[in-house]
């Protein structure tokens, strides 16, 4: 049974909703342009240990935006129902790549970077398997939940099959190690299952079982404990653990109303690590000011609103569920990133969709947008509007 805010009957006859998909495409384009500008400003004076200069980050991101934009356009014009056939291969490929980064003999294509093995170098492109897994889990969960229908309310034949597949994927992401992405993938699967009608009681049981596991995962690494202490008790946390969050707040505060100007921020000069990715919202706050922060919030808020409107009136159950999941993929990721930047959440390393540097993240966000638009266009085919 679907939750009441999802309209199972779909849109009414002759309802022209083309403005929603057009506005969604426009929002994605604006966010990408905003992101390219922000990445350039955040990395303009950066030189990496490997000799890369900051402008290379913006150029690489721009190339990713072009490729992702082309793919999103093609997906927007395709039939989203085909993704049901691709769900199993996608989850299989994602799981395979997640295993590849953990194998002891694959360091050549999956090197250790910043203490973790999270990327696979395929020669012409470097891929982050957990980003692919994020998208694949949403599509796969939506596919299977749509097939199960009312059986989703049972545990053995409903929820258990999802756990058998999703739990190992989440576990592989955790082993990279990437706890924040593992939790995000679990949350996205939960959103789709909840929307499909899974019992709240089952989620409560999973919460009781999962809470000790989450505590154990945090306790398994000193840096995770430090991050949680920074959030819960900043005064008792090590100084190096509070540094990032403190500098993030300093940068946002320094921006005041209109910001210090594009490329003029000081926090990126060694004070705030990963100002172009993990903390790009802070860079926007410093260089674009309160006005820039509000613009970002409005853009993401409108994107999520449109995504749920598309989901509510999708032509079939799979379309409804995949639209909810992909909207949550963008919305939850943005909320986590912004929450960390404002010290409202422990540091996670979750990127800001469309904006943070990272071509895997950008590609997934654009692909998600393309599929969302496809769901929106599918409604018009269903209700007879050309």
Where are the language model's segments positioned?
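Hydrophobic transmembrane alpha-helices and their immediate junctions
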Residues: 291-334
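Interfacial segments of multi-pass membrane proteins
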Residues: 145, 183, 188-202, 267-292, ...
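Juxtamembrane membrane-interface segments at transmembrane alpha-helix termini
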Residues: 97-110, 194-204, 214-224, 333-339
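Hydrophobic, glycine- and aromatic-enriched re-entrant/interface helices and adjoining loop segments
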Residues: 110-119, 123, 202-296, 314-322
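Hydrophobic alpha-helical segments of membrane proteins
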Residues: 175, 179, 183, 259, ...
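Membrane-helix interface "capping/anchor" motifs
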Residues: 78-85, 151, 195-204, 316-317
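Hydrophobic alpha-helical segments of polytopic membrane proteins
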Residues: 88-89, 93-95, 156-175, 179-219, ...
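Membrane-helix boundary/helix-loop-helix interface segments in multi-pass membrane proteins
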Residues: 2-31, 37-177, 328, 338-353, ...
């Amino acid at each position: 049974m679907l939750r009441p805010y999802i309209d199972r009957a779909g849109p009414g006859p002759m309802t022209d909703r083309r403005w929603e998909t057009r506005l969604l495409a426009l929002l994605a384009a604006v966010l990408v342009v905003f992101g390219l500008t922000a990445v350039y400003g955040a990395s303009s004076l950066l030189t990496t240990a490997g000799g890369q200069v900051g402008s290379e980050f913006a150029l690489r991101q721009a190339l990713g935006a072009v490729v992702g934009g082309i793919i999103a356009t093609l997906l927007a014009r395709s039939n989203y129902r085909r993704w049901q056939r691709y769900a199993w291969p996608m989850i299989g490929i994602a799981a395979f790549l997640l295993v590849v980064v953990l194998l002891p003999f694959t360091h050549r294509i999956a090197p250790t970077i910043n203490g973790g093995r999270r990327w696979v170098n395929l020669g012409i492109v470097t891929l982050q398997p957990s980003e692919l897994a994020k998208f694949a889990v949403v599509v796969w969960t939506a596919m299977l939940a749509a097939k199960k229908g009312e059986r989703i309310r049972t545990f053995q034949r409903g929820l258990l099959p999802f756990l058998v597949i999703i739990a190992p994927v989440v576990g592989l992401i955790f082993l990279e190690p990437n706890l924040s992405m593992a939790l995000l993938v679990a949350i996205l699967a939960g959103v789709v299952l909840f929307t499909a009608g899974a019992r709240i009681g089952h989620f409560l049981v999973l919460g009781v079982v999962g809470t000790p596991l989450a505590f154990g995962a945090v306790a398994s690494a000193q840096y995770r404990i430090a991050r949680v202490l920074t959030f819960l008790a900043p005064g008792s946390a090590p100084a190096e653990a509070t540094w990032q969050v403190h500098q993030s707040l300093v940068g946002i505060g320094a921006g005041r109303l209109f910001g210090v100007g594009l490329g003029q921020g000081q926090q990126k000069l060694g004070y705030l690590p990963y100002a172009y990715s993990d903390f790009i919202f802070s860079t926007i706050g410093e260089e674009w000011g309160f006005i820039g922060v509000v613009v970002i919030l409005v853009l993401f808020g409108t994107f999520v609103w449109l995504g749920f409107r598309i989901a509510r009136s999708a032509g079939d159950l799979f379309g409804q569920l995949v639209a909810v999941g992909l909207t949550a993929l963008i919305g939850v990721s943005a909320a986590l990133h912004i929450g960390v930047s404002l010290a409202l959440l422990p540091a996670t390393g979750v990127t800001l969709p469309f904006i943070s540097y990272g071509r895997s993240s950008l590609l997934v966000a654009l692909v998600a947008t393309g599929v969302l638009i496809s769901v929106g266009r599918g409604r018009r085919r269903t209700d007879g509007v050309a």
